[in-house]
Regions:
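Short, compositionally stereotyped local motifs that mark structural "simplifiers"
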Residues: 42, 46-194, 207, 211, ...
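Single conserved hydrophobic/aromatic residue that forms the stacking wall/gate
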Residues: 1-5, 9
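Solvent-exposed serine/threonine-rich low-complexity stretches and specific carbohydrate-binding patches
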Residues: 237-248
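Short conserved micro-motifs at the rims of enzyme active sites and ligand-binding pockets
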Residues: 19-24, 44, 282-283
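Catalytic cores of enzyme domains
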Residues: 28-29
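Active-site clefts of carbohydrate-active enzymes
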Residues: 10-17
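Aromatic, loop-rich ligand-recognition surfaces of beta-strand-rich domains
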Residues: 177-237, 252-300
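Conserved, mostly hydrophobic/aromatic
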Residues: 32
Length: 300
């Protein structure tokens, strides 16, 4: 058993993105307590509730010492899932000792707002705001979920990777491509996904939301094609777009939309993405395959 031969545990902290001591403290604490828990506590004694009680005692000492630490353990994780015409909203926090309060009209949640008890269905555009509370005090950051609605929202993706369902859940991604709202793929040379609108409709426009993260090698595809069908058998191409390397491998982190004029009628919409290939030699990640990330498929 390798665990019996393990002599120690080590955690690493890279500071190239830190500009002052407070930022280092924020990234170290209270994560360092979790490292110590993993290193010094025998498996038989590991218990989440016991650890939280000890952690609260530890952060109390950090408060007295004026140390800046992350309070992300009080933040809310969300999942908005298409469910055949509606969206299922699920909220959770890793701490079981807090209440989740939420609103659906865009107002700031308070200790008297609706108590989250179970996931619920959404069928209209709305702005959901939620936060954790303990003894009437807000503990974490407010989570804002603006749910938008278009012809693609909550519709069924055919023969798709489950991660692609985020493209029709009405929630846009942030500048953090790991925020669970960006669909990404293991292979990026050719990506295809098909949406069932459930009936033939006249389609004016399709928009694809993409993110550019130069440091991580995430870029727009070099070519996009949009195809339509009435029976999911024969498809015809209605729009396409080609991008040159200068337009693809741009520096910075930003979100960019790729619009396509359709002006056609169909039930099934197929989008084919062709990845940009390897990052050029002048790139910060030369030779690495460029990744494609899409947050939303918008059809008007």
């Amino acid at each position: 058993d390798r665990r019996q031969r393990q002599m120690c545990i080590r955690d690493s902290m890279w500071t190239e993105v830190c500009n002052k001591p407070e930022e280092v403290e924020y990234l170290i604490f209270p994560r360092l307590a979790a490292v110590a828990e993993g290193a010094w506590t025998f498996p038989v004694y590991k218990d989440w509730d016991r650890f939280l009680a000890a952690l609260d005692n530890f952060t109390g000492h950090l408060d007295v010492k004026g140390i800046t630490y992350a309070r992300s353990m009080y933040n809310i994780q969300h999942k908005v899932t298409p469910m055949d015409g509606s969206l299922q909203v699920e909220l959770e926090c890793i701490r079981p000792d807090v209440e989740i309060r939420y609103t659906t009209n865009g107002s700031q949640p308070t200790a008297k707002s609706s108590l989250y008890e179970r996931k619920w269905q959404v069928t209209t555009p709305q702005i959901i705001k939620s936060a954790t509370f303990k003894n009437g005090k807000q503990m974490g950051q407010t989570l804002t979920l603006p749910i938008q609605w278009n012809k693609a929202t909550a519709k069924r993706m055919l023969r798709s990777n489950p991660v692609e369902r985020v493209m029709v859940n009405g929630v846009r991604g942030s500048l953090k491509y790991t925020d669970s709202e960006w669909a990404s793929w293991t292979r990026n040379d050719s990506i295809a996904f098909t949406l069932d609108l459930r009936k033939r409709e006249h389609l004016n426009k399709l928009v694809l939301g993409c993110i550019n993260n130069y440091g991580m090698g995430v870029h727009k595809p070099k070519r996009v094609e949009v195809w339509l069908s009435n029976e999911d058998i024969e498809y015809w191409k209605v729009a396409s777009k080609e991008l040159d390397p200068e337009e693809i491998f741009r520096e910075g982190t930003f979100i960019e939309e790729l619009p396509f004029n359709l002006d056609d009628t169909g039930r099934y919409v197929r989008v084919i993405l062709f990845g940009a290939g390897e990052c050029p030699l002048t790139h910060v990640r030369p030779g690495q395959e460029a990744r494609v990330c899409v947050d939303e498929l918008i059809i008007e």
